[in-house]
Amino acid sequence: MATPRCSDPTIDRASATDLMTLASDHGPVPMNIGAVLVLDHGAGLDLRAVEAVLADRVPRVLRLRQRLVRTPWGCGRPLWVDDRAFDLRRHLSETRLPEPGGTDTLLRVAAEAVCEPLDAGLPLWRARLVTGPHGDGAALVLVLHHVLADGIGGLAVLAALSDGTGSPAQALGRVPVPARTPRPRELAVEAWRGRLNAAVHPATGLRRVVGGLRELGLADGLPRLAPATSLNRPTGSGRRLTVVEVPLPDVVAAARAGNGTVNDVVVSAVAGALAGLLRSRGESPGELVVSVPISSRRTAQPDRLGNETGVLRLTVPTVADASERLRSIVATARTRASVRGGGSAAMMGVVFRALAGLRLYQPFVDHQRLVNTFVSNVRGPAEVASFGGHRIAAVLPVAVVPGNVSVAFDVLSYAGRLTVTLVADPALVPDLDALTDLLAAELAGEVRR
């Protein structure tokens, strides 16, 4: 049989938000995101079975078979190209939990997996099968580089890899023919065409600048600095994870009662928990600044991942009254309700790339006073999903952030439950268990009101 010819190339470049992510990826932890799929009745699931499932489903997601490569000088932004030597086995591994096993040990393994850099010469993802000490139970830890997908894009990947999705053609596991890599001349022509288009239509760029200023809260001038706290010190290479779970309908009801959103309720609870922890350390800031990602899209498709996310800075009073905190958050969010996410990322990307070029990026993020913490919230599937015939009992989100934010909060709704993963540098947050208990109490208080 004749070898099929390569298809004509599509010039698929990294976006402005992708460039910001790449500029940010210079610290002691990589810019990775991940998810832990806890499988019901996972006993008997082995790496060979996982490989068979993924061999059918990875072709559904183009990015999982593509590498991000730099282009020659004058040829524009980095380029996504098909990995002609793609080998699924390079992306798979297996770990058996040591005694006694359990959730805490699983979370430790997941933290190690997410904090391990991905091979830049391969498609930027990996999957690790984690089994119990005696082969009892299983979980799949999926790790993606943030440049490959944001939170919403990550959900599209999970959906494509789960059972019962994809077209009949995709279900056959047909591997697409790799496209020919564009030649330097083609890249240069396309890059200059884009530059000329931007020069001819400056209004588009101006609108993005204005939108970015609004996202960052800079439309009316420079914001107040975030308070200096013991939680904001340069972080190292290790992370520890803990988890808080609550019934999603209870949080939805609390949000409606306060005229807010689920995310507003979570941010209020996070601010209350952090304030309580800081008080136990002898600190009493009057407010905390929380960074919340906002996306320019509601959903994503497996063939359109990437990053389309900006940031929203929320200044939250640290009062004990949860109702007052929530009212403040709702009022701020409403003033920026018309903001379309993504503009701030484009602006910050320019700044971050300049800092990286001057070797000043890491000192900047290690001592920044823009935010105290991050809260990332993604709406997951409402129904229970499965993988390889095994029911996915829980999905635990994990993302690591660089700089001087020693604890961040990753939030995901799935099948009627709301899960908050606390991701902390254990050297700077040795009292993470206390913070976890405080957050659980704050969320319980929010839903009881």
Description of each model-found segment:
Residues A2-T17, A35-V405, V411-A440, A444-R449:
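Soluble acyl-CoA-dependent acyltransferase catalytic core bearing the H(X)4D motif
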